[in-house]
Amino acid sequence: MSKLLDTINSPSDLKKLSLDELRELAVQIREELVNRVTLNGGHLASSLGVVELTIALHRVFESPKDKIIWDVGHQSYAHKLLTGRREQFATLRQHGGLSGFTCRDESPHDPFGAGHASTSISAGLGMAVARDLAKEDYSVISVIGDGAISGGMSFEAINNAGHLHTKFIVILNDNGMAISPSTGALSKFLNNVRFDPRFEFAKRNAKQTITNMPFGKAVWAFTKSIKRKFEKSMLPGSLWEELGFIYLGPVDGHNIRELEAALKRAKDFESKPVLIHMITKKGKGYDDAEADAVKYHGISPKSGGLKSSHGLSYSQVFGQTLHKIMSQNPQVVAITAAMTDGCGLGEIAAAFPDRVFDVGICEQHAVTFAAGMATQGYIPVVVIYSTFLQRGFDQIIHDVCLQKLPVVFAIDRGGIVGDDGKTHQGIFDLSFMSLIPDMVVSAPSDENDLQHLLYTAVNSGKPFALRYPRGFGEGVEIESSLHNIPIGQNEILVNGSDVAILATGKSVAFAREALEILTESGIKPTLVNNRYISPLDSELVLKIAQSHKYLVTVEENVISGGLGSRINTLLAEAGLVNKIKIANIGIPDKFVEHGNQSLLRAKYGLDGKGIAQRVLSLVGNPNEMKHPQIICP
């Protein structure tokens, strides 16, 4: 790490630097980001794009007194470097180290934790109103990207902020050119005028002078109408001003001097929220990331790029299968929320551009949009990461299941996802989806199971959830033809005695590993692929309970409300609680921290060794568990 960056231990150190030193610091920060993210993995392109903004923010404002809120938080790496976490930066996204997002527990400079999009304006407005109620004096700044601002929650907050007239700053990081910047001499002139305090002074005095003249109010109203028409045709900020914001920009997001001028100007406004429109280049300063910002949005550890392929990932198998199904059935459509490539829909979107819909970061809308299409005879497949589907829970109940509409939910990244941590682990979906009446909930044991379950879902005529994990498949042979798997029918993979392991999804593969360990100890368990969580294969569960002494459930999901809980309830209702000993292996009632998938599975007893140890503990202590109990690692 270069010497200049080594001297920055807190934001106050930035204020001692000259403009040339600040520019050099920006170069050094980018070098550190590229080096560290290449080793540890993480979100690179977004962080590279806001280096100058981060420097300017910490020079103009006084963090942590002033509150700087980063939407999503994945672009906060430079912020971490400049706020006393430089020496810990090598631990970024490592188990026990710095989070890849903002985190209140990590630093007072992170006033609001993040991981999901579109929350920063609501949170910032809440802080600003709390400040006013307490009669305190500090600034609140929310930084949000042009993707995250498309989320409905952002617009709800913007509408509320304009109504409240609270002192509050929103910075729109426009790195996708979704809002075309004005260019040329006129734009530069207007920006210079807007950032000049004399402009507001002159405007206020002009209004006072004109309105005091005969017919002055009418003249002023006419003048304002002309101004509005001019702005609507020439300036990108008229929408914001209609919403009650003062608009500043567009600003060059890589010009520290211009950024500081805009921030200082925004800081001076007392009675209205301000929006600063900043234009940046995603991946700035790293040629590969600038050339392909989508690819370098998130990279894997020690590769400097995307994961090398040693087989097909679950997302790829899903995409290939859906492509095949859509080729055969023109009524099938795909819907995603700003994750076309991440969810394996890229090639499908190219092949069927009229039948693949990316609705932006709008999960609630995605679900009800799908419901609307389903009423007209289409079969929508909604493809969303598990952690983000939580946002559409009410719509799943109210708009899909209450009306029994045939919407398929392809839930990617189910289970432990790893280094992205607490905000991204997909550990609640089996619970919240299986509690909804009329919802089929399934989890394939491997990639072949996945393709057949997707085919089943599309042909079921029911609300159907298909949950699959992050990462590569199990390497099994993928059959060329698709077939239906009867809903609610699970399968015995291995016949054994005394002990039965009922595993779902990815846990089936780890249960197979456990069988090898247990066999060496003289235990030969029955293994069930519990692919359907709802409806349960009650007949099979009861049959196993009556023919085995021990029953173990395994799932990468919170135990509460998941597979284990449902089986416990079934056995209790059948009066079998005193006839079989039960252990439920899963996630305890806690949020799972960041760390690689293998480490976390080992920690929570979800790998083959952990499952085997739990079974040995259960079988080796006959006095334990006279009644069903939840057993957590």
From Swiss-Prot:
Recorded hits in Pfam families, A to Z, give: DXP_synthase_N, Transket_pyr, Transketolase_C
Q: Which residues bind Mg(2+)?
A: D146, N175
Per its record, the protein catalyses: D-glyceraldehyde 3-phosphate + pyruvate + H(+) = 1-deoxy-D-xylulose 5-phosphate + CO2
> How many cofactors are bound and how?
Binds 1 Mg(2+) ion per subunit.
Q: Which InterPro entries match?
A: Dxylulose-5-P_synthase (IPR005477), THDP-binding (IPR029061), Transketo_C/PFOR_II (IPR009014), Transketolase-like_Pyr-bd (IPR005475), Transketolase_C (IPR033248), Transketolase_CS (IPR049557)
Where, by residue number, does thiamine diphosphate bind? Answer: H74, G115, H116, A117, G147, A148, N175, Y286, E363
Pathway(s) where this gene product acts: Metabolic intermediate biosynthesis; 1-deoxy-D-xylulose 5-phosphate biosynthesis; 1-deoxy-D-xylulose 5-phosphate from D-glyceraldehyde 3-phosphate and pyruvate: step 1/1
UniProt entry keywords in alphabetical sequence: Isoprene biosynthesis, Magnesium, Metal-binding, Thiamine biosynthesis, Thiamine pyrophosphate, Transferase
Q: Which SMART domains match?
A: Transket_pyr
Q: Which GO terms describe its molecular function?
A: 1-deoxy-D-xylulose-5-phosphate synthase activity; magnesium ion binding; thiamine pyrophosphate binding
User: Known SUPFAM superfamilies for this protein?
Assistant: Thiamin diphosphate-binding fold (THDP-binding), TK C-terminal domain-like
Which cofactors must be present for this protein to function? Mg(2+); thiamine diphosphate
Give the E.C. number(s). Answer: 2.2.1.7
- GO CC: one term? cytosol
Please, one GO biological process term? terpenoid biosynthetic process
* Record has DNA-binding as a keyword: no
**Family, per entry:** Belongs to the transketolase family. DXPS subfamily.
The record, for HAMAP family, names: DXP_synth
The job of this chain, per UniProt, is described as:
Catalyzes the acyloin condensation reaction between C atoms 2 and 3 of pyruvate and glyceraldehyde 3-phosphate to yield 1-deoxy-D-xylulose-5-phosphate (DXP).
Q: How does it assemble?
A: Homodimer.
- How is this protein named in the record? 1-deoxy-D-xylulose-5-phosphate synthase
